[in-house]
Amino acid sequence: MAREFSLENTRNIGIMAHIDAGKTTATERILYYTGRIHKIGETHEGASQMDWMEQEQERGITITSAATTAQWKGHRVNIIDTPGHVDFTVEVERSLRVLDGAVAVLDAQSGVEPQTETVWRQATTYGVPRIVFVNKMDKIGADFLYSVGTIHDRLQANAHPIQLPIGAEDEFNGIIDLVEECAYMYGNDLGTDIQRVEIPEEHKELAEEYRGKLIEAVAELDEEMMMKYLEGEEITVEELKAGIRKATTSVEFFPVICGSAFKNKGVQILLDAVIDYLPSPLDVPAIKGTLPDTDEEVERKSSDEEPFSALAFKIMTDPYVGKLTFFRVYSGVLNSGSYVKNSTKGKRERVGRILQMHANSREEISTVYAGDIAAAVGLKDTTTGDTLCDEKSLVILESMEFPEPVISVAIEPKSKADQDKMGTALSKLSEEDPTFRAHTDQETGQTIIAGMGELHLDIIVDRMRREFKVEANVGAPQVAYRETFRSAAKVEGKFARQSGGRGQFGHVWIEFEPNEEGKGFEFENKIVGGVVPREYIPAVGAGLEDALKNGVLAGYPVVDIKAALVDGSYHDVDSSEMAFKIAASMALKAAVSKCNPVILEPMMKVEVVIPEEYMGDIMGDVTSRRGRVEGMEARGNAQVVRAMVPLSEMFGYATSLRSNTQGRGTFSMVFDHYEEVPKSVSEEIIKKNKGE
């Protein structure tokens, strides 16, 4: 089967936003206008095509990024719908990694919100070009230019409107196209009666002002256009389009457009903008990777002629076909039934069937080409972030990094039958989601699950019940505290046991010191002259790593410290790896009195939106939760409070906010960093963990 769409005519885009900005509705409308859906599903009726897991339809939020393919004006557009809820940032992170461009959806009333900032930061990390779609122009309080202002203020992004709305709220009935200097008027809310007309007289002055600003902004990034502009020459529509495209694909400029997906206004123009301004796989830099044996850097160009290489970015369990591996092809061609190498794991895999997905329906295809996104059936060992490549031309593409979980709960099956199924369910779910972990607590024997927030774990438990028929009781949430050292010291660990026959002997001197935040544990061997034989050195490192997992103060993992083995002694007969492991853990215990250990807690960036009259109560409440208020501003007729609050103080906040504001307040939070716990709180945590 020959390639249906050329690489130039392929777009791989993501749709990203804060929860409730109308992202899934926008995707739905795109699928509707590109002919993939016959009846539109409304999110608030629980009928959306992209949200196909039961919980997504119930909660009206998107949890897993469904990958869908659509066609528009001779182009193939592969769309990944990403979740806007903060607990699912891993989904956003994975999809951004494999996209060439993205549409950031904003709510016209709120502009940039906290999760928008998080997602925007992730997109910047991966160098993803973006268009901004200011949605919900029909909503009360919609303000396009305010929203554009928030992009400058909060994201420090070089964003400029390439459209202006005609009217707002109930009066929103048209869009001015600043590039083509025309307007589109909507005769109804069905998107069927659209007329291209001249810009209405009363809007001409504003349109001219903003077109001038647009040309100036684009010319600043394009020398040729700048010369023409300065010499007062006319800049043609084609030149302006080419300038916007070049500046957008190089991530120096972000075009802003507007509309109301729900009212079917602006969606076709959004699709045109995706084609006009977002890059094809040929416009983005060739993907870099390394050779498995030598770590030498190589690149793979977007071409069917190059050897096959792809990145697995999502694993899903499908009730009918089993495990689905979603992957993005960067180079070469793959046929179903062929063998590939998983170079990350060094395993050979057979690709059974290849499916192209449309939300929750699928079409079987025999071949995928460079630039395509598809799902494979039959890959046994592949997990998120693995590279798949041609067996004769190995490469490891740069993988993704996922944050550590910040919250955990104990979970126990309700019956013996549930217990057997729970193990399978948890291993499948953690295979799908790298930020979800499950382990058994050695001391209590309880199963502990950990994730990125309360909603994340709620949904995991929910999926266990629905998909795997496992009924379980869930304990109270626990915060993932960490421990670290604040000062350096040299300490001794000596383990000697003599009880007839062969004894045990290990003796070490270790220098501990704080490490930079986020650097983790680093072990260094500074032994000279063989006072500790070389074969026992790894045992010292391993002994420390094991001991660090169980903490020194309250049983939480110790992070961000350096340990150097500087001296020690051994016994010809009695020394063993085990003895040195134990000596190392004894040294860590001895460090407690000298290295000033402290407990660290996860801090959350919180944004609360409330009516003005509740401002005092909310500020007091945030402070009582050990929060630091970092900023306030008016947004329409509401007030926004931004604060940094410890996660441990945020449990049950939704209920408290509801009662404090008669249900009129909303909040969102995202993990930010770890910070030292105050002494009084630290003592409480230690007491609680010792069962006092």
From Swiss-Prot:
A Pfam family that the UniProt record links to this protein: GTP_EFTU_D2
SMART domains in alphabetical order: EFG_C (SM00838), EFG_IV (SM00889)
Domain tr-type G: 8-282
Keywords: Cytoplasm, Elongation factor, GTP-binding, Nucleotide-binding, Protein biosynthesis
Positions bound to GTP: 17-24, 81-85, 135-138
Gene3D superfamilies documented for this protein: 3.30.230.10, 3.30.70.240, Elongation Factor G (Translational Gtpase), domain 3 (3.30.70.870), P-loop containing nucleotide triphosphate hydrolases (3.40.50.300), Translation factors (2.40.30.10)
GO molecular function, one term: GTP binding
Keyword DNA repair (UniProt): no
GO biological process, one term: ribosome disassembly
Organism superkingdom: Bacteria
Family: Belongs to the TRAFAC class translation factor GTPase superfamily. Classic translation factor GTPase family. EF-G/EF-2 subfamily.
The gene coding this protein: fusA
Compartments, as annotated in UniProt: Cytoplasm
One cellular component term from this protein's GO annotations in UniProt: cytoplasm
Record protein name field: Elongation factor G
